Curated annotation (Swiss-Prot):
[4Fe-4S] cluster 2 binds at C24, C120, C123, C136. Keywords: 4Fe-4S, Electron transport, Iron, Iron-sulfur, Metal-binding, Oxidoreductase, Repeat, Transport. This is Polysulfide reductase chain B. InterPro entries: 4Fe4S_Fe-S-bd (IPR017896), 4Fe4S_Fe_S_CS (IPR017900), ET_IronSulfur_Cluster-Binding (IPR050954). It comes from Wolinella succinogenes (strain ATCC 29543 / DSM 1740 / CCUG 13145 / JCM 31913 / LMG 7466 / NCTC 11488 / FDC 602W). GO terms for molecular function: 4 iron, 4 sulfur cluster binding; metal ion binding; oxidoreductase activity. Component of the phosphorylative electron transport system with polysulfide as the terminal acceptor. [4Fe-4S] cluster 1 binds at C14, C17, C20, C140. The gene is psrB. [4Fe-4S] cluster 3 binds at C61, C64, C69, C103.
Length: 191
């Protein structure tokens, strides 16, 4: 059976340290003016017991199964690998930027060097190709990120999915993200 990669971001374990962002930049040589991954910090919010609470939201590609970015690409430069990772072939890209406009997660950007769209790809060309986990997962000091093969019932990601309540960002759009969120139980920030 083919691997299908996914990731979980546990908002209860995340401390907003940005180690994942820095590791991503270093591993993938991301220019300073753009990002594949950010952790947005919301807060503080004062809780009823007087303590302060922050909420940490991961902003990156959510690796959709039903990919709006792929379906609008006229040259098939945006595509889904056999392992479910949404990718960009820079050599096929004509720079129309339809994929950036179609992404409801604002996860793509124009690389200032290649002039083509780029996004998180779970470090597929570097770490994943060597049998390692994505850089962001490896450096997280609180283990807030879980990565793995969702087609393997015994994988760590499936064990976490079975044991914790999760949601998928903007799931109502029908995109079927493979990035799952364990929502903040500490009283996150209200919209």
């Amino acid at each position: 059976m083919a691997k299908k990669y996914g990731m979980i971001h546990d908002e209860n374990l995340c401390i907003g340290c940005q180690a994942c962002n820095i590791a991503c930049r270093s591993e993938n040589k991301i220019p300073d003016s753009v990002y594949r991954l950010q952790v947005w910090v919301q807060g503080p919010k004062k809780l009823p017991d007087g303590t302060l609470s922050f909420n940490y939201h991961r902003q990156s590609c959510v690796q959709c199964e039903n990919t709006p970015c792929v379906s609008v690409c006229p040259t098939k430069a945006s595509y889904v690998n056999e392992d479910g990772i949404v990718s960009v072939n820079v050599d096929l890209c004509v720079g129309c930027l339809y994929c950036i406009a179609a992404c409801p997660y604002q996860a793509r950007y124009v690389d200032p060097v290649t002039k083509a769209p780029d996004k998180c790809n779970f470090c597929k060309d570097t770490r994943l190709a060597r049998g390692e986990e994505p850089a962001c997962v490896t450096v997280c000091p609180t283990d807030a990120l879980t990565f793995g093969d969702m087609s393997d019932p015994k994988s760590k990601i499936n064990k976490v999915l079975a044991s914790k309540p999760t949601l998928r960002p903007k799931e109502s759009l029908g995109t079927k993200p493979k990035l799952f969120i364990v929502p903040n139980k500490r009283g996150g920030i209200e919209s």
